[in-house]
Amino acid sequence: MNSKTSQTPSAGDGTMDRRNFMGAALGAAAGAGAAAMMASGAAAAADSPPPPAAAPPMGPPPGESLRAPGGASGPKLYRVEADIRDVEIDGKIPSDLNGAFYRVGPDPQYPLNPHNIPFDGEGHVSMFRIQNGHVDYKSRYVRNDRYKAQAKAERILFPMYRNPSQDDPSVNGLSRSTANTHIINHRNYLLSLKEDSPPAALDLLTLETIDPNYRFDGQLQSKTFTAHPKIDSETGDMIAFGYEAKGFGTDDVNVFQITPQGKMVWNAWIKVPYVSMIHDFAVTQKHIVFYVMPLAFDEQQIKNGGIHWSWNSGQPTYFGVMRRGGDGKDLRWFKGPERSSTHVMGAFSDGEHVYVDVEMSQYNPFPFMPMRDGSRWDPVKGASQITRLSADLSKKSLKDYKMEVLYPGFFGALPRQDDRYNTAQYRYGYLPCPDPDPKDRSKRPAACWVRFDHQTRKAQIFNSGDGTTLNEVVFAPKSKTAPEGVGYLMGVANRNFENGRSDLIILDAEHPEAGPLATVKLPIRAVPQIHGLWVPEYQLKTA
């Protein structure tokens, strides 16, 4: 494997041709959300032709086939639940790294409808259990209502992403949740999340489903629950929200706060300017921030049998800020140009200034999301970069928000931070991205993980080399009280030249360019992943 350290390159240094960018966008999750799942098909995506015609009313643009959510050379359906003891390790697991690395992603039980998108598919959770230098691997499907109904029927019953009008009549009124997007540790449960439904509660150690529709002891008022709750850096409280909270297509958002013991201590309702995919949000010690973008609810497309969203080009964005703990009446919406922002790296308040670091593209980041105006998807405009959004709340007449690209030469999605700093000012961020300065520009850039230092604006790069696709990277602190950024980075690498076989790579977070401290070598391909979570040993001992 190759590695290097880099200063932030100029915008020109990061320029890619259309073919390379398409491969990088899919292969390094430079779109957003489930692009890590798409990443496993990166080798094929790099050779895909651009869409030749206008987008259809549903599904991917013409010429864009749906990529298998697993390894590049693997089968389109994976469905392997595994238990592997003492996985082979190259190198040495650090003695202070003990806990569990969890992952979740869509792994369809049955072939997807050809007009459906890769966001769909039943949630499959995996765990790398790390103890005393040894690693065990386990994976299990989330056994929720949807999974059990389809298993009994032995066929797909929910054929279109977030469109209940297409469901089989036998599942009318049944929860449609896939529980396939993210996971979080709460009250000794592993909550598997999908933003259109309540969570599913799993056992932290066995991954068996305990409650397929977990509603926090009846306290959850919203019909939905975000895939990206935040943990307060001081109290450990969980701040979360649901959009379309009063039902399908509604403009209601419910935001709330729950203690580590499970008590809801704050609850507020707000309205949004229009119904869009609010996949993530930002929380600081003082403020809540929502971002409304033109990936919008498309009622006509749904009536025509299509998916929930389409990109409504030309529609403005809105940066909404409200104070934590209030009733939401102080909510202010700041207007901006057409943009997409799907994930938050970190956020903080400095007096009345609010700062939110996000992945941001000029427009639709997803090649499989329909363009409402029928135009072709543009991979260049769909490229995401880490961008700082800000607003000065002391200026009562302020109508818009500011945008600053922090690292112009880097394109990527699925940003992360040290999660202990979810609501506090932070220094380090992490991102999967294509190599910003490949030696051979005629080839598809290698996949990298990058550590950004916001104080110096420098970047350190781990380069995975040829034939590898990297999933999202997650930070694990050395200890509960370790300084920010002192610990390890870990994530799954799919080996595209080995039929998609997977490795877990562990790096020194302070020196990722030095290469792996340890490589955990699975004999199989790991289950698909959108997001992952590190849970330290001291939290598992209470489970």
Regions found by a protein language model. Give the residues of each.
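N-terminal secretory signal peptides
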Residues: 1-17
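Beta-propeller domains
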Residues: 21-33, 49-543
